[in-house]
Structures are given as C-alpha cells and as structure tokens.
Amino acid sequence: MAGHSKWAQIKRQKQAADFRKGQIFSKLAREIHVAVREGGPNPETNVRLRMAIERARREGMPKDTIENAIAKASGAAGGAAEYETIVYEGYGPGGVAIMAIALTDNRNRTASVVRHIFSKYGGSLGETGSVAWQFETVGQIVVATDGHDPEEIALAAIDAGARDFEVEDDSVIITTDPDQLSDVAEKLEAAGYQIRQADIQRIPTTTVELEGGQAQSALKLLEALEDLDDVQEVYTNASFPAEVRSAV
C-alpha cells in the first residue's frame, strides 16, 4: 500500500489542523449527552462518559461547556433533546465499505440525508450488517511522540496492556482491546506521555486501494458524511493515493 493513506490518517491530519472545531464540539456534546442518559452523570462509574469528557478536554472544549452538556442530559437544565444511536452501512465508489455512526433526534431526517449523500457520490446505502463484518472494533490511542522515542512509547503501551502499535508521522497509534482502552490510556498519561486521542474505533480488516476519479468521489462522500451534525464517526476500508491525500 506504498503511497496510499487510510481514511483514519486523513481524519487525524484534518483534526490536527484544527478544522471545524465548533462542529467537533457539537458532536462531543452529543456524545456526552448520550453517555449521561445511558449510564448517569458520574464519570467515576460511567466509563463512556469518562472517555467522552477526556476526549472533549483533549479537543480543547471549555470546562463550562462540558458541565452544561452533562447538566442538560441529566435533567438539571432544560431543553435537552433525546438522541439515539444509528449505524448506517453502505458502499462507496469502487465497492469500498463505509460505516457512519449517527446520534440523532430524528432518524427519518438523518436517514434521508445520509441516503442522498451516498447516492450523490456514486455509492449506495445498504442494509444493517452489510459491511460491518469487514471491520473490527478496537480501542485506539494516539500518543504524541513529543521528543520521545516512538519505540519507547510503544513498549510502554505494550507493557500497559496494548495489543499493537503503528508509528505515524509525529504520533504512535496504539491499539487495545475495547475494554482495556481507558486503563492503557491512563497508564500512558501517568507515565508522562501526551495523549491526543483515546476512543473506540472500527478498523478495516482489509483495505481497498482507490485511484483517480473513484478516490476523489469516495473522499467527497466520506467528507460529506463527516460534515453532518448528526454523524459522529465515519469508517471505511478505502485507502487513498498521495495526490488525493495532499489535496485535503
């Protein structure tokens, strides 16, 4: 796959460049809301909420905004919408698999918009389970090298219970079992490493290399899904050539 980049790499580059910060905050507030509704407002006993708060802090979300999101979801403040999680699965140009995870207060609205985006860029929305089997759910931690030897970070992660690692630019991407994510992240942070991101991800078991027009169309489809306020995460098994990556 020399010269090609995975969608996850492209997303991390965009986030590092501080793109769409307001939209990121909006999505994080929704995640906090759902976490509170499912497990209560105490991050000590609610792992999903604790992870959402940690991610919000790493993204620079103000403390007051985090606290307001928790208060709204717990009923201490009025005006809270009710969200449900919906997973959309489909195919993009070149037959690549795509998953979009949405938190929505209107499933009909979201389904209509998602279907339109798939169609607009040469894809098709599929049935539940149509592509999920092509992905594995893992914990993923992005650690800044920040002057440290990447191998040193990787060894510390393995000692803390991580499964695997990959060095990427100025980061080390750590993979864990989902239930080990929080524990490994806490140990790395306690050891003095800078955690840029720690969350549950769906990674493709194999990738499909795209070229030319198919790569351009697939990237536009993925970015259009990412731009939807209702969509929290987008995953694909596509990989993209360097010229498409540099155009992002």
From Swiss-Prot:
Cysteine disulfide links: none
Principal subcellular localization: cytoplasm
InterPro entries cross-referenced by the UniProt entry: Integrase-like_N, TACO1_YebC-like_2nd/3rd_dom, TACO1_YebC_N, Transcrip_reg_TACO1-like, Transcrip_reg_TACO1-like_dom3, YebC-like
UniProt-listed SUPFAM superfamilies: YebC-like
GO BP annotations listed: regulation of DNA-templated transcription
Gene Ontology MF, one: DNA binding
GO CC aspect terms: cytosol
UniProt family annotation: Belongs to the TACO1 family.
Protein name: Probable transcriptional regulatory protein trd_1132
Native source organism of the sequence: Thermomicrobium roseum (strain ATCC 27502 / DSM 5159 / P-2)
